């Protein structure tokens, strides 16, 4: 299973433990039913949650929701993280050092010369002549650019010169050549420690000790590891907070969508009821209707008073097609127009919906006249 999904689920479960009312929302019904079907028991909702579930909820204040979400966000990643930065230095910005031509053909003579340069560089290093050691290691690298130990040795001098970025470049090159050597990881770990890169330092120093245990690397690992762990815990904390915010936002979106759907249903129901009232022969039929309609049918609006005894009325109102036409605003507007002025029927000769209703009513009333 995707670890990210597992983390999201863990954050959701934690949120449910803190606020069981989340489980009593309508969209979480499926989860409640599943828990209960497995023999589990869902904690009761708070009184507030119950009242919200049983009454129509007001539309949530989106600004308040946004403010609540922002309140959970840290002002910065370092907002409540305090790390001892003793020994951390500013990064060096020198131009990259010479790395030699890795595609050059290396002769045995060049290898011997490179070894001589390496020996001289180590002597200079032991004498404290650090820059001389750098120059000699560089000469050795140019003679034999595919020997990982030369880069690792030069990196150790860069660390002593407090040039951690230069040391990291040398260690990266040494690891490319021989990833199983402990020395490049040791010196890269020390360089990262100088820069305050605690997690990277802990990773490299631990790997160096794993490949070839070194007391010096182990001592520095013990120094940086607590800081690296503190940073990792800090990151996990805010990842959990972010996941909890995402879950809250999803629940809020579902809640808003449900409210929008319910509001749309209420509006549709109101429109349907309004249409039903509108389709009840408003305004009567003054002056009679052509086609054998009886001479005027006044008083038909608002429930058609006075027509209860009209022959055939119940049959007309039970006809599905007539009822459907009475629900159509276009048909009823035309019907009113013709009722007020029968001569206007000619305007609707080409409208089958209007003519169909008039024909049906004419037939019904004509049969009773």
From Swiss-Prot:
List where this protein forms a coiled coil.
Answer: none
Name the residue ranges with Basic and acidic residues bias. Answer: 49-73, 256-272
Organism's domain of life? Eukaryota
Alphabetically ordered keywords of this record: Acetylation, Chaperone, Cytoplasm, Phosphoprotein, Repeat, TPR repeat
SUPFAM superfamilies according to UniProt? TPR-like
Start and end residues of each stretch annotated as Disordered:
38-97, 256-300
Residues covered by the STI1 domain: 319-358
One GO BP annotation of this record: protein folding
- Gene3D superfamilies with a match to the protein in the record: 1.10.260.100, 6.10.250.3420, Tetratricopeptide repeat domain
Q: Where in the cell is it found?
A: Cytoplasm
Query: Is Flavoprotein found in the keyword set?
Result: no
* TPR-type repeats, residues: 114-147, 148-181, 182-215
Tell me the residues on which N6-acetyllysine occurs: 353, 360
Its biological purpose: One HIP oligomer binds the ATPase domains of at least two HSC70 molecules dependent on activation of the HSC70 ATPase by HSP40. Stabilizes the ADP state of HSC70 that has a high affinity for substrate protein. Through its own chaperone activity, it may contribute to the interaction of HSC70 with various target proteins.
Q: Which family does it belong to?
A: Belongs to the FAM10 family.
Spell out the PANTHER family in the cross-references.
HSC70-INTERACTING PROTEIN
Subunit structure, as described in the record: Homotetramer. Interacts with HSC70 as well as DNAJ homologs and HSP90. Interacts (via the C-terminus 303- 319 AA) with GRK5.
| Descriptive protein name | Hsc70-interacting protein
Q: Which organism is it from?
A: Homo sapiens
The organism's taxonomic lineage, starting at the top: Eukaryota, Metazoa, Chordata, Craniata, Vertebrata
Q: Which gene encodes it?
A: ST13
